Amino acid sequence: VVLQSFKDKIGISIMMENITVYDDILSPSDTSKYAEMIFGTCPFFYGEVDNESTPPTGMVCDFTDMGEHIYPEIKTLLNTLLNKIYEKQPTLKDTQLYRIYVNLFTPNENPYFHIDGEKTITCLYYLNPQLSYDEGGETQFIVDEDIKVVCSKPGRLVVFDGEIQHRATSFRHYPRLTLAYKFLIPQ
């Protein structure tokens, strides 16, 4: 009941069930600049799993506990995007931001469907350089036994209920970078 009332309060049912999409959160040049910076400077680690029963896919750079070890320009990006998230979804200020990280998938990886957790709101920001439907790279959601897709348009922010089963898809020819913010809904 608390979770549903919170979902109703923040109104994340605009595009499809509990998923909202915002375009042009940052300019294309800023998105490209930050993508290059993250790709070139962040320490990515292999080993993150989507479920306990699946092997690892992709790599992760987790900013959550990096503190002073984050480059100032990247810290600016993280704070700018967080402010944009709060601007679009003001009631997320009443939640606990518990994780910020970047997913990196190399071409033709095949991630698994998963949930992010109970009472979680997830925000994804697409840092890829371009949108090409033939390349793939979308986020897939299982909604009412169908797969719904949000294309990974550069500069796009998608906000969704972390209990929705979803997965990234990789691109065919270039890496896929997605910045993720995860919020815990209060009890």
For the regions a protein language model found, what residue spans apply to each?
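Non-heme Fe(II)/2-oxoglutarate
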Residues: 6, 10-94
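Catalytic core of non-heme Fe(II) oxygenases with the double-stranded beta-helix
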Residues: 75, 79, 83-187
